[in-house]
Amino acid sequence: MFSLKQPKPSFRSYLLPPQQEDKLNPETKIKKLKAVLLPGEIVVNEVNFVRKCIASDTSQYDLWGKLICTNFKISFITENSVPFQRFHYKNLLLGEHDVPLTCIEQIVVVNDTKRKQKILSHNQKLKFNPTELIIYCKDFRILRFRFDEAGPESAKKVCLALAHYSQPTDLQLLFAFEYVAQMYHKPEYKVNGIDPGGGGDFCQRTPLFETYSDWDREIKRTGASDWRVCSVNEGYMISTCLPEYFVVPSSLADQDLKQYSHAFVGRRMPLWCWNHSNGSALVRMASIKDLLQQRKIGQRVCSGITRSHPLRSDVYKCDLDHNVPSIQDIQAAFSKLRQLCVNEPFDETEEKWLSSLENAQWLEFVRTFLKQAAELAYVLDFSRRSVVLQEEEGRDVSCLVASLVQLMLDPYFRTIVGFQSLIQKEWVMSAYPFLDRCNHLKRSEKESPLFVLFLDCVWQLLQQYPAAFQFTETYLTVLHDSTRISLFGTFLFNSPHQRVQQSTEFAIARNIQLGEEKGLKFPSVWDWSLQFSAKDRALFNNPLYIGKSVPCVQNGAVKSFKRTKNYSSTMRGMPPSVKNGMAIQQDFMPRRNSLILKLKPEILQQVPVIIPSSGFEQYLRDWFTKPADLHGVILPCLHGTHIKLWKLCYLRWTPEAQINHGGFITAFHKISLLASEIELLQSRLRQYRAYPLSTVTSPVGEQNRMFFRPDELHSSNGSLDILTSSFPFSPIGNLCRRSILGTPLSKFINGAKIWLSTETLANED
């Protein structure tokens, strides 16, 4: 019934590899395959002799194995290796062919004989035996499985189980609850040797803003001396949409806050976000629903914010409900982007691809939010006025805008720990509804990818100022993927109150003793050691970044974040006529591209020229004409092609979009080697100064900051073959497209020489 094909001769060798005798036949071997399960994870259903399709029109390279559905993931287990795949970064929670249930967007079953197909929903019946299963994922992957050799009833059961468990109707049915329950009942359970929610360098240093002290430290770090930490919402007595502790003007008493809270939507009072060194503050609040008291309460709140400013400057109000796209518009644009990136066949849509991308409006929305944040940065930095972000509920687009403003103005948030603390402060603790917006419970009417849009905006800044960020594009992509893993409490709830309430109810039902804890303790996504090894976590470190020590807090005051005029961090020795990508004069100094500029003078016309028709545009013009200090303010360039598509995130599973030995990773590889070698030399120099007469050796573990290191060049053969524009992700094995394997394009992608040389042509003659 079932047989595995013998390997065919490859292009490099016409000899079959030696076959080792195996006492177990292929059928028995597949039946004995077992899934690797986490604590609390159970196998719901499984089916043997499943074929995972590597491409849609050939079975030569397909994989045979077992398809397993658990309460956490869909897992395909095989003993075969994926063809042409030389590297795949390893997630310690998920196997190479695993997909979390919360990452599944749509399930389609097909019967070839009856020519039927159906989209499976929760608790639906299936009247035919499926011969094929297609899974559309939220990260733009498409997985295809064939049941030609599998039992028809087993195939039907696993499809129904997958539809049922991937579309839960209750929050407590998500896997994180079962995982944590096992941890509390059996403390000996650990994942990768680490307790849930603890461990990891970044996790230990990332403030979660769940305590009074975290907010107090942030006040002192920013020098907000006229602001105080308020505990009026302790126990969520005032609002379930606010954290227990938050920051308010010192002039507003707790009694005033209690009185004003009833007038705001969701009782979300003004919430302090950040303070500039000049005294201006960034504040968020919901709309005032009581129209009769709107003017009165608004004036009192603004008066309190004004008194907290050393210059007593007027408050600038920004109505985000009218200034930026709605969450519905953002969802519609993202749906068009997803359809464009997963559409097949790719070659038939290539001609109109760019116009379709423009019509999706996703990049235009990215530009809109970056521009809005830059305008508010101008108000805070140049006008020295406090800014109040007002939104209907104050917990959606205000999260995005507030985060971008702080990212542009404060270099601390461009470090890994600072960026994680920013997300904790402005998204998690400020009650951004991750449960609804990520659609973990399949309530599509509330879904909107605001957090994805935020990461995209951050990526745009990272591309424009690669030396200003401690983290890399890989870090942002992995963070994007982590929102689809239903294990971390970080992206699982609509608010901190919901986490406490739901976990407390679950603990009572499961007879879990919480003690003094407020609800169950879920693993934090910032504990990256739960997902990746120390080696893989090195991909998060940007070799271009030059860190700066955190400013010391003295009497509530910190050093200014202002840029210095004499420092250019974009390129040493850059001519004064070119600053921050802005051309000031026509007489360029000799550069590598000077010949191109002379041959094509029209290129100069593509350089963005800002007409100073307003204060903001004059501010931009002045900023772009000065050398940038990447430890100070950074502003986005919004013109022309400066806003790009985040290809690593959206097109990493599309083989037609890959560049073998190309993309930014090639430069990243060289820079990492150079940075690693510099660190090694510095380490040896420090050791020599300490022990000048001793033999200088390489300290173990001291030069591990970079993923690529000089000491591995000689030990790894063909290490450059793993470098593609989708690194460290591999599109092979995640396809639902016309096969390109064995074609000239396939050979080119895999490094083969497909063009004939002049010597070859001469010899043939």
Curated annotation (Swiss-Prot):
InterPro entries: MTMR10_PH-GRAM, MTMR10_PTP, MTMR12-like_C, Myotubularin, Myotubularin-like_Pase_dom, PH-like_dom_sf, Prot-tyrosine_phosphatase-like. Residues 209-650 form the Myotubularin phosphatase domain. One of its GO terms (cellular component) is membrane. GO terms for molecular function: phosphatidylinositol-3-phosphate phosphatase activity. Pfam families: 3-PAP, Myotub-related. GO terms for biological process: phosphatidylinositol dephosphorylation. Belongs to the protein-tyrosine phosphatase family. Non-receptor class myotubularin subfamily. PANTHER family: MYOTUBULARIN-RELATED, MYOTUBULARIN-RELATED PROTEIN 10. This is Myotubularin-related protein 10-A. It comes from Xenopus laevis. The lineage of its organism: Eukaryota, Metazoa, Chordata, Craniata, Vertebrata. The gene is mtmr10-a.
